[in-house]
Amino acid sequence: MPISRNSIVGAALAFGLLAAAGSAQTLAPEVQAKVQAKAKQLSSWSTDPVIVEAVKAHNANPPAEYRDMTQEKWKALSVLDPSVRAFSKNPLGQHLKAKQDGQITECFVSAADGTKVAFLAKTTFWSHKDKDKHKVPMAGKVYIGPAQLDDSTGLLEVQVGLPVLDGAKPIGSIVIGLGVSKL
């Protein structure tokens, strides 16, 4: 059976996408513009009262059952573990789910210390405090990361990090993954 030109082109594109997905990559200008526009649209989440109040409550009184959580313990937990599911089933997790659109592949809200307050699905890491996706928003700025294959979703995505603001003060971060193929 002869191999068609379309098969070769399709295979080359798939290989190129997979090779590029293995590491961070630069987005085409038109995709960058779409990411910027989506980040601007999502910026209202920074002052969403449900998000702000949940982060303030968590910062004031972190749940005792998570005070000893480590990255290693977190990675060992199943997505079905009740302590993991609590983050997607809590009121903020449900609020995030209601806000999700077809372009959002993941979303998590972190407290000032980088630990989780809520998410759509289990994150790869328990704390992102040392990552730019949390540090930049905690400085009151928007973070837009490179396109990369996300470990938790398995999709090529760009992460947008926004500050959670109490007035003008950053008190936490929101990281929203945008599927590159969905933009």
Segment roles from a protein language model:
Residues M1-A11:
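Bacterial N-terminal signal peptides that target proteins for export
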Residues G22-Q25:
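Boundary of Sec targeting at the N-terminus
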Residues G10-A19:
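Bacterial N-terminal signal peptides
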Residues L13-A14, I104, S173:
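Extracellular structured ligand-interaction cores
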